[in-house]
Amino acid sequence: MVVLRDFWRHRRVLLTGHTGFKGAWAARWLHRLGAQVYGFALPPETEPSLHALLKTPLAGEMLADLRDANAVSAAMAAAQPEIVLHFAAQALVPASYRDPVGNWTSNVLGTIHLLEAMRHHARPLTAVIVTTDKVYANNESGAAFPESAPLGGDDPYSASKAATEIAVHSWVKSFFAGRHKVGTARAGNVIGGGDWSADRLIPDIVRAAQRQDSVVLRRPEATRPWQHVLDPVHGYLRYAEALHAGKTGLSERLNFGPLEDQRITVGTIATDLTRAFGAPAWRHEPQQEIGEKGVLALDARLAQQSLSWQPRFTTQGALAATVAWYRDWMSGAEAAVLTDRQIAAFEDGL
């Protein structure tokens, strides 16, 4: 933990997507570590929003769209970062079907605008570009994907994030060699307190419990690499440190996911959480137009070996921490207190 704090103290960080769920947790942790965090993102899209509840102090903030190249360049100039953490994205599969063009321009063109701002930045940069576990060509064999697996994507979201990976690789090889240090981080199905996004399992269950209604599941048999938000965020920070230090042999792409024996179906999680929140039993309503894969798993051994990173939460532990956060918040506890408490407990184990 001392090493983590020593690295990030007073470090200038441009964090995109800081108003989102995962970005809000990252901003909070970076602030606790003493970093100077500059946020760039759209205004929060949910009510409530974790970003608004936490009120994390920032060194600077710009609420704008990644598709606005001038705004991205202005944010880079204002922040003068040493580290870039790129979280901002359209991150939902169902939303990518409703607006595929917006999904692609946000995820691919938006990232290219960031890469271009980095290309024209005067000082060397270290950047972690966060994509998703869904970048792989998924034949639903059940095998966990290593970083060397082919990229693909049948749905608009997955395809856009695979294309983002290709764009990052191109900019690194064409423009950044010997100057900027960049890696892509692949993780997904992140859970934790303070997520109110639409079309996500845990927030849907929380909302259903508040209404005393049944949550609707599209694919209860699907399995996902569920992980508590602090595990991948810890991985991203470790990755940025290693990239910045120029660690020999470090891969330019890393998976961050739970241990392979932690696979649990959507239906099992929904059953456990509806009971925990006292909500009615879930019901199944297939939506054929949403082409989500039923089986998805990541092989995160490379991150474990190269960064000495390990997921600290089991899936059940991640669920318990998530339930505790929402329960306490619904009972009147402050979001900042709950979030700081869970970050501190996580830090104590490092």
Label for each model-derived stretch:
Residues 26, 50, 204, 299-300:
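Residues within well-ordered alpha-helices
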Residues 1-187, 345-346:
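N-terminal Rossmann-like NAD(P)+-binding domain of SDR-like oxidoreductases, especially those catalyzing
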Residues 46, 54, 194-198, 262, ...:
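Residue-level signature of the cytosolic catalytic core of signaling kinases
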Residues 32-33, 64, 209-350:
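C-terminal substrate-binding subdomain of Rossmann-fold SDR/epimerase-dehydratase oxidoreductases
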Residues 44, 68, 134, 189, ...:
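Residue-level detector of flexible, active-site-proximal loop/helix-junction positions
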Residues 69-70, 82, 94, 101, ...:
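Residues in well-ordered alpha-helical elements
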Residues 139-144, 148, 156, 162-247, ...:
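NAD(P)-dependent short-chain dehydrogenase/reductase
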Residues 16, 66, 105-108, 157, ...:
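Short, solvent-exposed loop/helix junctions and linker helices
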